[in-house]
């Protein structure tokens, strides 16, 4: 279920508290979805036009086909495909970053220098960049860190707060 496109209706109905449904959601999932909903709720409450980037963000997490559940009647069962959609993957988590963008990260999934990646963090729109050559903690160049939890250094174009995510499109489509 996804109600991000209908938060105005929810607020008009007098509902002032919502929650994410589901079990065992990752920190990435919780951060992306709550951030997107928070931005849309703030826009709706302020009477501003909703920035479409926040709707797009909920497509960047692992999910099944989205629906509005029973909010607008009984839509019937969705039989076409119950597989998860996993078109984006977390590559790394920023653990530290200075004002110049010199960041320390912890690897989650492999990626390589030259890959197109996105950085997404609290209170900021995602931004796209090309992954630079990285360095291990001893200063040696890393072109493709592969071992999960590897700590490495990477130059970012600007400061990003700790717990920001590096992600990339995986072009794998829906998988079980």
Regions found by a protein language model. Name each.
Residues 1-176:
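Surface-exposed amphipathic alpha-helical tracts and adjacent flexible/coil segments at the periphery
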């Amino acid at each position: 279920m996804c109600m991000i496109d209908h938060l105005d209706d929810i607020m008009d109905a007098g509902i002032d508290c919502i929650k994410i449904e589901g079990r065992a959601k990752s920190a990435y999932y919780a951060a992306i979805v709550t951030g997107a909903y928070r931005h849309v709720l703030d826009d709706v409450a302020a009477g501003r036009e909703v920035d479409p980037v926040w709707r797009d963000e909920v497509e960047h997490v692992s999910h099944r086909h989205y629906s509005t559940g029973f909010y607008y009647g009984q839509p019937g069962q969705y039989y076409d495909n119950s597989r998860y959609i996993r078109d984006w993957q977390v590559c790394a988590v920023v653990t530290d970053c200075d004002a110049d963008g010199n960041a320390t990260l912890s690897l989650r999934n492999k990626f390589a220098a030259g890959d197109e990646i996105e950085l997404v963090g609290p209170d900021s729109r995602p931004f796209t960049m090309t992954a630079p050559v990285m360095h291990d903690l001893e200063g040696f160049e890393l072109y493709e860190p592969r071992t999960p939890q590897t700590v490495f250094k990477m130059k970012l174009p600007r400061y990003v707060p700790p717990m920001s995510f590096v992600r990339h499109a995986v072009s794998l489509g829906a998988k079980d």
